[in-house]
């Protein structure tokens, strides 16, 4: 089922991109 794999792939990408964006925003605020 390609729909389920693409769904989990989207969750994996979101779970890796979101923390990176939060860390980037926190670093910008510290600067």
Curated annotation (Swiss-Prot):
Coiled-coil stretches: none
Keywords: Chloroplast, Electron transport, Membrane, Photosynthesis, Plastid, Thylakoid, Transmembrane, Transmembrane helix, Transport
Transmembrane segments: 4-26
Subcellular location as annotated: Plastid, Chloroplast thylakoid membrane
GO cellular component: chloroplast thylakoid membrane; cytochrome b6f complex
Primary residence: plastid
A biological-process GO annotation: photosynthesis
GO molecular function terms attached to this record: electron transporter, transferring electrons within cytochrome b6/f complex of photosystem II activity
Cross-referenced Pfam families: PetL
Topology class, membrane: Single-pass membrane protein
UniProt xrefs under InterPro entries: Cyt_b6/f_cplx_su6
Family: Belongs to the PetL family.
Its job: Component of the cytochrome b6-f complex, which mediates electron transfer between photosystem II (PSII) and photosystem I (PSI), cyclic electron flow around PSI, and state transitions. PetL is important for photoautotrophic growth as well as for electron transfer efficiency and stability of the cytochrome b6-f complex.
PANTHER family named in the record: CYTOCHROME B6-F COMPLEX SUBUNIT 6
Subunit and partners: The 4 large subunits of the cytochrome b6-f complex are cytochrome b6, subunit IV (17 kDa polypeptide, PetD), cytochrome f and the Rieske protein, while the 4 small subunits are PetG, PetL, PetM and PetN. The complex functions as a dimer.
Name of the protein described by the UniProt record: Cytochrome b6-f complex subunit 6
Biological classification of the source: Eukaryota, Viridiplantae, Streptophyta, Embryophyta, Tracheophyta
């Amino acid at each position: 089922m390609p729909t389920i794999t693409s769904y989990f792939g989207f969750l994996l990408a979101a779970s890796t991109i979101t923390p990176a964006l939060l860390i980037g925003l926190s670093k910008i605020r510290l600067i």
